[in-house]
């Protein structure tokens, strides 16, 4: 289900002043490492491929990075932890379009939406990632549409398959 989305930073561009440093681990778009077959059936590597195990990655393909301080988002990205459904009349195990902000960013902080807050988000804007054996949804700050007050029955949801591998 998941393509390897973790990379180690070997070099950073001089043109950008980034908090990402050499040696940091980054979570990138799945197409950076994608291998596909063209119309003639020939195996091709992504346009990000350089040589050996080295790939170029544009800043908009980097969603999260880990340094000595922990995980940090890039730009307007944020990560949401799904919560368990408390509905007895559904087979869905998680609540739709509601979750707990795991990793935020400065624009959300300015709106007083901080990690640990219960938030609602728009449909079809989230991408599923496995970060340290936790299933999280990556989305843009603009996809967060409401901050909820806790009712007390919210519980994080992490499917059992996320713990393997």
Describe every region a protein language model picked out.
Residues 1-165:
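Acidic-enriched and Gly/Ser
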């Amino acid at each position: 289900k998941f393509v390897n989305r973790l990379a180690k930073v070997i070099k950073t561009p001089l043109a950008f002043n980034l908090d990402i440093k050499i040696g940091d681990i980054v979570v990138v778009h799945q197409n950076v490492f994608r291998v596909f077959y063209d119309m003639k059936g020939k195996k091709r590597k992504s346009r990000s491929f350089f040589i050996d195990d080295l790939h170029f990655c544009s800043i908009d393909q980097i969603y999260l990075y880990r340094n000595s301080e922990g995980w940090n988002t890039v730009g307007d990205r944020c990560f949401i932890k799904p919560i368990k459904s408390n509905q007895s009349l559904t087979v869905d195990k998680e609540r739709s379009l509601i979750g707990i902000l795991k990793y935020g960013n400065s624009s959300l902080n300015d709106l007083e939406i901080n990690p640990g807050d219960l938030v609602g988000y728009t449909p079809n804007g989230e991408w599923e990632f496995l970060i340290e054996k936790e299933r999280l949804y990556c989305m843009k700050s603009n996809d967060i549409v409401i901050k909820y007050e806790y009712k007390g029955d919210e519980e994080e949801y992490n499917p059992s398959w996320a713990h393997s591998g």
